[in-house]
């Protein structure tokens, strides 16, 4: 359980687009509304909602926004019932693989837009719904070093089923299998007074990376920004890596 976590660099690429905070919060709200609609507005009995809330909190979404999204469903709104999750993958930018997570109430619109984005950038779409072999789905929890002592945190995390543990410059990063994420996070909640997790979500991590230069990375980030501007697209992942970035 040593070395450098890929998440430490991946998150910098992935969240380079997060300056558009309003758009980001809108997408978190949609995810919360859909989860609450499908499984109920009580996060204690709805794991999907609990996960969506944890993810939003970790990205500093205001508590009032989260409560408003939940209250909308509790008040009888059925907006979330029309949304369906979709997963797209494809290659572009000279062999870089992209994985795109979507929540849409209009499959035809979404499908047409995705095809347009990849065609415009000389890309090729993979099979809809398939996860490329270059990505692994993992639970990720990142905690500021000021919030916990390393030895105690590592011991508690491993006993709760963590699959890996890394100490970075300013934070601890804990990996888990997706099926064990909720148990792990609840255990940390019970044992530590962590006000704000830096990251708390089930996400995709590249296990095989494509090395690119800064110029190519800028093109990739522009493509990611284009994708994330689409209201139907929730998350965009890629396996490009720039050593000089």
Swiss-Prot record:
Q: Which InterPro entries does the record match to this protein?
A: Integrase-like_N, TACO1_YebC-like_2nd/3rd_dom, TACO1_YebC_N, Transcrip_reg_TACO1-like, Transcrip_reg_TACO1-like_dom3, YebC-like
Query: What PANTHER family would the database entry show?
Result: TRANSCRIPTIONAL REGULATORY PROTEIN YEBC-RELATED, TRANSLATIONAL ACTIVATOR OF CYTOCHROME C OXIDASE 1
Against SUPFAM superfamilies, the record matches this protein to: YebC-like
Principal localisation: cytoplasm
State the organism's lineage.
Bacteria, Bacillati, Mycoplasmatota, Mycoplasmoidales, Metamycoplasmataceae
Query: Which family does this protein fall into?
Result: Belongs to the TACO1 family.
GO biological process terms on file: regulation of DNA-templated transcription
Task: Decide whether keyword Cytoplasm is in the record.
Answer: yes
- Where found? Cytoplasm
Q: Which GO terms describe its cellular component?
A: cytosol
Name recorded for this polypeptide: Probable transcriptional regulatory protein MARTH_orf271
Matches recorded under Gene3D superfamilies? 1.10.10.200, 3.30.70.980
Among NCBIfam families, the record links this protein to: PRK00110.1, PRK12378.1, YebC/PmpR family DNA-binding transcriptional regulator
Keywords, alphabetical = Cytoplasm, DNA-binding, Transcription, Transcription regulation
